[in-house]
Amino acid sequence: MKIANTFIKRGAAGGLDLSQAPGVTLTLAERRRSRQRLDLDEGRGELGMAIERGQTLRDGDVLVAEDGTYVVVRAALEDVARVTAATPWQLARAAYHLGNRHVLLEIAERHLQFEYDAVLIDMLAQLGGVTATRLRAVFEPDVGAYGGGHRHGHDESFGDDYALAQAAYHAHEHTPMRTPMPADTATFIPVMATAASTASMTPSLDAGQLAALLHLSSPALPIGGFSYSQGLEAAIELGLVHDEASTLAWIESQLVTVMARAEAPLWCLLFEAWRAGDDAAAHGWNQWFHASRETRELRQETEQMGRSLARLAQELGWGTAATRAAVAALRPATLPAVHACACAMWALPREAGLGAYVFSWLENQVAAAIKGVPLGQMAGQRMLERLRAGLPAVLADARARAGATPPRLDTFAPQYALVSARHETQFSRLFRS
């Protein structure tokens, strides 16, 4: 089998005689790989490709085999969304928001194109001023400043060359992503609850309700929570988390800037909607949460866990048939939506359900750190003790945000999104992406 070690860009191939040259039709994913076996079009044989890693082939580029023969690259038609707008400003605005979602984007003079994603289509519809059309077309996203050059072994170019990945990925230190976190950036003061606040936050549960809450919070619940690190594994890889102190700072930061400001108050809104029988409001907040997940990894995580919990509720017959049907109609079901519904089904107090939801998240984060950093079991228990002490203040903040008019939901967490995006293509992982 012939091997192509180099290629000629389409702009420089104008003087070549390609009239008899075979072609090879490749998807974008295939054009981004550096090492693979290619089946030529029309059954004209096969070609091995081993070009410099980090390159993206484009329609019209020409692969050069070791014997000097040429093979023309043809881009395959793919399922894409094409975005058009009445004004350049509206198109630029759409590009900005898509860029915030780390979307591979093809930018033309009068339109944008990206791999079709129904969630992104919904986001654009909410922005307004643009039209998104689904079609089959060649997809050549702009590689910008990231095309070629040095890579870190996180991308699919290394999919079939483990030794090369190890050499590129583990033979050097990664440059820190940012400066170290200031000592007071991600800490909160543990609040000792007064007798009055304790009564409002921890309403009494009968034995059946307590058992139901423990069941829903159990690590043995088969919804896959232990499989995810929510960016923590990437933070470890980047050197942001490396010992007990930095782990505690990271989890505290996520607790007070991500969980307390968005996911926890949203859980409260979902719980109140389910308890009031307002399926439309519950579905609306479910969609809002799904659209707020900034990376594919985070969207797929909440989809998988929500779907698994919904299936469990269906098979065990939780709640009424009407409520189970309303949960089944969620498209897609997210974890906070289904968890809040389960608490409402069992008539659990809101404060108890919210506390269980947030503590389960904390417990999963600590368990992920014990495996990934790694840390000892006592270190994990010390962190849980510290985090648990500050939980009342976090829950109070979440309830206040949910009770405001309109609700004060804040999803601004750029580092969290960037670290999650890095984890999607991290070469070596313990946790799901």
From Swiss-Prot:
GO MF terms listed in the record are: catalytic activity; nickel cation binding; unfolded protein binding
A Gene Ontology biological process noted in the UniProt record is:
urea metabolic process
Span list, region Urease accessory protein UreE: 1-200
Q: Which InterPro entries does this entry report, sorted A to Z?
A: UreE (IPR012406), UreE_C_dom (IPR007864), UreE_N (IPR004029), UreE_N_sf (IPR036118), UreF (IPR002639), UreF_sf (IPR038277)
Give start-end ranges for the coiled-coil region(s).
Answer: none
Instruction: Give the top-rank taxon of the lineage listed in the UniProt record for this protein.
Output: Bacteria
Q: Name one GO cellular component term.
A: cytoplasm
Task: Write down a Pfam family by its short name.
Answer: UreE_C
Q: Per the record's keyword annotation, is Chaperone included, yes or no?
A: yes
Q: Which UniProt keywords apply?
A: Chaperone, Cytoplasm, Multifunctional enzyme, Nickel, Nickel insertion
Q: Which SUPFAM superfamilies match?
A: Urease metallochaperone UreE, C-terminal domain, Urease metallochaperone UreE, N-terminal domain
Question: Region Urease accessory protein UreF: which residues?
Answer: 200-433
Do the record's keywords include Cytoplasm?
Answer: yes
Location relative to the cell: Cytoplasm
Q: How does it assemble?
A: UreD, UreF and UreG form a complex that acts as a GTP-hydrolysis-dependent molecular chaperone, activating the urease apoprotein by helping to assemble the nickel containing metallocenter of UreC. The UreE protein probably delivers the nickel.
The UniProt function text for this chain reads:
Involved in urease metallocenter assembly. Binds nickel. Probably functions as a nickel donor during metallocenter assembly.
Family the entry assigns: In the N-terminal section; belongs to the UreE family.
Its recorded name reads Bifunctional urease accessory protein UreEF
Query: Which species does this protein come from?
Result: Bordetella bronchiseptica (Alcaligenes bronchisepticus)
Gene symbol here is ureEF
